[in-house]
């Protein structure tokens, strides 16, 4: 038997990163651990969707997508937008005591902002909702959506803006 699967994805226009920087909070108890800030300006057309990822050079084998990495412009269309991001570790990485979730002075980080189409955003959103609700007996059941007809998974075209941040 022949199984046919079909998928399509629209390559959206690139939305460049305006700035990315490493920030140690004023309330920090460790002067070498901080957060990553990224900003961009959303185009004035409603319906843009994004995904964010990061990779520590020489430490992470690939870009890491944290939970909550996908969003759209329904809450801020056509305006500058800045957000702070914690560091997610790669699978099975042991974190030193007190350093989980923080970037560290001396890290060189590639920050990537991806413009994705609405179908990809919707599929990713159902996946993230399902993963974040695991083990919660009060969470409603979630069916993870796919944008592949006749199959499971995602077919995603993305335009990416990448910035390099030196954590100093």
Regions found by a protein language model. Name each.
Residues 1-168:
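A sequence/structural signal for flexible, mid-protein segments enriched
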């Amino acid at each position: 038997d022949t199984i046919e699967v079909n998928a399509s994805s629209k390559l959206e226009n690139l939305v460049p990163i305006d700035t990315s920087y490493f920030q140690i909070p004023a309330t920090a108890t460790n002067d070498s651990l901080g957060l990553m800030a990224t900003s961009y300006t959303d185009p004035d057309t409603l319906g843009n969707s994004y995904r964010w990822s990061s990779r520590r050079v020489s430490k992470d084998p690939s870009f890491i997508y944290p939970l909550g990495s996908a969003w759209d412009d329904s809450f801020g269309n056509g305006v500058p937008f800045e957000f702070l991001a914690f560091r997610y570790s790669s699978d099975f990485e042991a974190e030193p005591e007190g350093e989980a979730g923080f970037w560290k002075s001396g890290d060189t980080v590639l920050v990537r902002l991806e413009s994705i189409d609405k179908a990809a955003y919707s599929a990713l959103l159902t996946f993230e909702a399902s993963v974040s609700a695991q083990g919660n007996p009060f969470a409603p059941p979630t069916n993870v959506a796919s944008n592949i007809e006749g199959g499971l998974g995602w077919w995603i075209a993305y335009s990416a803006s990448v910035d390099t941040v030196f954590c100093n």
